[in-house]
């Protein structure tokens, strides 16, 4: 896990530049997220530099945006942002929040890069209200185009921590196997296929 955090600490200053090419796709994703978080209390884990949180915060009541990388959070705190948004360094596997604290939990582009994604899902479920919504967009690398495969190859050489290479169908099945009901899914065409999902707690 320390190596994982080191990768993001080293690349925090480059992250926004890297993501810029997918700006149009991310705008579509923000449009999908805003109605879900409207007037809601939101937790985002693996916020990175806060791209998603900053673009949806006007719709939300409040957002706690967290990341394991101190350097990513330092980047996120640069510039002006809404008073409804708070950034902090937290462990997505052991969050400090009380159970059933949030209306919405966002885990964006993180489940494929951690060694135990099911553990993160359990912790997300713990802090989510019974009638809450999990938003979990994830790059599904098994469906990469040829240029995407080349890009992923060089990212791997640079130390990018890819642990799960799902197809969109495999990813949805993974969520269902971890007791989530997928109420909405859309595959967006970014540098890599991005499977956007909204889920509800099947156990409730």
What are these regions (language model features)?
Residues 93-104:
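A short acidic, Gly/Pro-enriched loop at the edge of an enzyme's catalytic core
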Residues 178-180, 184-204:
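Core SAM-dependent methyltransferase catalytic element
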């Amino acid at each position: 896990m320390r190596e994982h955090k080191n990768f993001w600490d080293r690349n925090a200053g480059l992250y926004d530049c890297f993501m810029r090419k997918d700006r149009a796709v991310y705008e579509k994703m923000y449009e999908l997220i805003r109605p879900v978080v409207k007037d809601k209390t939101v937790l985002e884990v693996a916020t990175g530099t806060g791209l998603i949180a900053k673009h949806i915060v006007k719709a939300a009541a409040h957002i706690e945006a967290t990341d394991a990388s101190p350097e990513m959070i330092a980047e996120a705190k640069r510039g002006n942002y809404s008073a409804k948004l708070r950034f902090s360094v937290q462990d997505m596997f052991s969050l400090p929040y009380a159970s059933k604290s949030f209306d919405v939990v966002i885990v964006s582009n993180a489940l494929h890069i951690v060694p135990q994604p099911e553990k993160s899902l359990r912790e997300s479920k713990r802090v989510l209200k019974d009638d809450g919504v999990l938003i979990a967009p994830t790059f599904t690398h098994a469906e990469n185009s040829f240029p995407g495969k080349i890009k992923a190859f060089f990212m791997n050489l640079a130390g990018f921590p890819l642990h799960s290479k799902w197809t969109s169908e495999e990813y949805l099945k993974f969520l269902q196997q971890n007791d989530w009901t997928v109420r909405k899914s859309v595959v967006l065409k970014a540098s890599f296929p991005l499977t956007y999902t909204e889920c509800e707690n099947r156990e409730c």
